[in-house]
Amino acid sequence: MSLFDHSVSELHKKLNNKEISVTDLVEESYKRIADVEDNVKAFLTLDEENARAKAKELDAKIGAEDNGLLFGMPIGVKDNIVTNGLRTTCASKMLANFDPIYDATVVQKLKAADTITIGKLNMDEFAMGSSNENSGFYATKNPWNLDYVPGGSSGGSAAAVAAGEVLFSLGSDTGGSIRQPAAYCGVVGLKPTYGRVSRYGLVAFASSLDQIGPITRTVEDNAYLLQAISGLDRMDATSANVEVGNYLAGLTGDVKGLRIAVPKEYLGEGVGEEARESVLAALKVLEGMGATWEEVSLPHSKYALATYYLLSSSEASANLSRFDGVRYGVRSDNVNNLMDLYKNTRSEGFGDEVKRRIMLGTFALSSGYYDAYYKKAQQVRTLIKNDFENVFANYDVIIGPTTPTPAFKVGEKVDDPMTMYANDILTIPVNLAGVPAISVPCGFGANNMPLGLQIIGKHFDEATIYRVAHAFEQATDYHTKKASL
C-alpha cells in the first residue's frame, strides 16, 4: 500500500505519531516516479535536491504548532505556473530553458502551507489541447491504460496523481483542462470560480477564462488544497475580494433537500450512452440521500464551443505576441533582420496547435471581422452566463457528465482538430460563465477507462460543490479504484 493511498489528514496523523517522516513521503514520490515515469511521462522537470533538503527541514518541525495546512505533502505543479529557480516551459520549445525569477502567488501559498514541490508537470503546449499530445517534448500517457490519452491540457497533473507519483497537483482550466483529464484519469479535479484563486504567475492562455485549481485522489484532499491557495491577491487585478470559507467544515455528507438541475443538452446529442448512464446512476445515489433533480435547459450551450474557440484564440493571439525572441525564450539562429527574428523564432518555437489558434485569433480580431466574430462571441458569452444564472435562481447545483465519452486512444484524434475540440463541449460553458465545477469519478466505460461526474455550482459557492461531491464519493467506491500501472 502506497503512502499516497492515505488522505492529507491521515498522513498528518502518521507524521505527528512519528510513524513516518516527511522524508519518507518525498522518497515515496521519487521512488514511484523512478518506477513508472518512463511509461507515464507526467513530469517535465524534477526538483529532487531542493525537495529532499526541504523534507529534512520539515522533519525537524514535525509536531510544531505553527506548521502549515499541508505540512510535508508532496505536490506536482503544472508547468505553466512559474516557479522561482525551477524551469518553467509551458511544454513549449519556445520556453525550453526559461528559468523564472519569481514564484506565482499559488506557489508562494503552497510554500507557506509547507508543501514540497516534487517537480513540474507535462501539459499541452501553452495549455492548448485536450489530450496532452500537443506537448512540445513528449506525450503523457493515461496510467489506467498506456494506449490511451490522459486528457488535457493538465494531462501530466492528472496522470501523476492517478499513477501515485504525487499526493496531489495543481492544474489550470481554461475550457475544461482540469476537469477533463481528472475524469479521464479517475481522480478529482476542481475549476474554482474565476477570481477565487490568483492567476499571478500563471502564463496566460486566455486571461478571461484561465483559472488554477487542484487535482487530487479524494474530495477532502481537494478541499484542503483549495483552502491553501484561495484568496484575494493584490498582484492579480482579476482576483476577487470574496471571503474564503472553511471548505473542510462543509464536508458533512448531508444533501437532503438539495435541488439538482440536469440540463437536457448535457445528456443529449453528442454525449455517449456510457456517460449518460453513469450520470443517471449517480443521480439515483443522490436521490437516495434525499436530493431531488429536474431536467432543465441551458439553451445557448449549443453555441459554447464556437464562442469559446473564438474568444480563447483571440486572447491567445494577443497574449502570445510577447514571445518574439527579443526578451526571453528561444531565439532563432536563422536571422538576417528584425522580421526574420520575429517570423523564424515564432515558427520554430511554437507547435502546430498553438500556431493554429494564433492564426484563428488573429483572424477574429482583424479589421472587418472583429464585429462579426469576436464581438458577437462576447455577446453570446453573456447569454450563456445568463442561462446559468436563470437555472441557479431555482436550483443549488447543476449536474451532468464531465466528458461525452471515456478517454480515447493515443493518436486517435490528433489529426482531426474539430473532433478533438468537441471533447470539451460539456466543460467549456462553465468557463464562459465563470462558475465553479468539479469532476469526481462516477464509473467506467466498456474500455475500462474512468468516467467523471461534473457538479457545477453558483459563483463562489465551492462549498456546496464539495458537499455534494463528498456525499456522492462516500456513498460509492469509485474513488478507491486505482490504476493498475
UniProtKB/Swiss-Prot annotation:
GO annotation terms (biological process): translation
Family membership: Belongs to the amidase family. GatA subfamily.
Function: Allows the formation of correctly charged Gln-tRNA(Gln) through the transamidation of misacylated Glu-tRNA(Gln) in organisms which lack glutaminyl-tRNA synthetase. The reaction takes place in the presence of glutamine and ATP through an activated gamma-phospho-Glu-tRNA(Gln).
Enzymatic reactions: L-glutamyl-tRNA(Gln) + L-glutamine + ATP + H2O = L-glutaminyl-tRNA(Gln) + L-glutamate + ADP + phosphate + H(+)
Main enzyme class: ligase
Subunit description: Heterotrimer of A, B and C subunits.
Source organism: Bacillus cereus (strain ZK / E33L)
Superkingdom of origin organism: Bacteria
GO terms assigned for molecular function: ATP binding; glutaminyl-tRNA synthase (glutamine-hydrolyzing) activity
Protein known as: Glutamyl-tRNA(Gln) amidotransferase subunit A
